[in-house]
Amino acid sequence: MNKILISILVTAFLVISNLATSTTVLAGDPGPPKEKEWKGKGEKIEFQSMPILTIKDFLNGVVPEKRNTIWGTLNFPANAPDKNVPVVVLLHGMGGIHESAEFWLSALKSMGLATFMVDSNWGRKKCKKDSNLKKDIKWCAAANRGMNRVIDGYVALELLSNHPRIDPKRIGCLGNSLGARGCLYLNVKRFQNMWGTP
């Protein structure tokens, strides 16, 4: 009987402390960590993508006149052939590129896959100055819950499909957090028609 009572008390304590911790963290949420430009190994390739859009403009396919220059870093395994190399596009979450991305870059490289790490945040870090979204968003990286990742993904796919060393039939996408949403939504036909390249 004592073991059951102790189990109930321990479980109740863990549940209550977990709820209290979550509330504290959410109440004092400072936002994403301070942004810094990621300088990974490989060839830095700049490309044009969309600025931060309102969710309404994204869903309606409204293309703004202005573009943002963002970039990705293309890295080939040491033993990669001169052509037909498969590649994985990596899309990060709201907080930018972290250690988990480094793990995936290393793991994919060890499997003989090239990687293209897209930095969606750094080129848009001044979105509050450059747009009319100042009142709508607290952090640039959080705007639209990462829907710009979808557009970045399409542009990256087009860019890589024309690269002389990449096999255009073997391009994948791997993302974490908002980047995972970006990879998932690349498959949505509606978004392909609005933002992808036919």
Kindly label every feature range from the protein language model.
Residues 1-9:
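Bacterial N-terminal signal peptides that target proteins for export
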Residues 14-24:
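C-terminal segment of classical bacterial N-terminal signal peptides
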Residues 28-83:
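N-terminal cap/lid segment of alpha/beta-hydrolase-fold proteins
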Residues 60, 145-198:
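Primarily recognizes the serine-hydrolase "nucleophile elbow" in alpha/beta-hydrolase
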Residues 83-93:
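Short beta-strand element of the alpha/beta-hydrolase
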Residues 87, 112-116:
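A fold-wide structural signal in alpha/beta-hydrolase
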Residues 95, 99-100, 107-110, 119-150, ...:
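Cap/lid segment of the alpha/beta-hydrolase catalytic domain
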Residues 117-118, 175:
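Hydrophobic residues in well-ordered beta-strands that form the structural core
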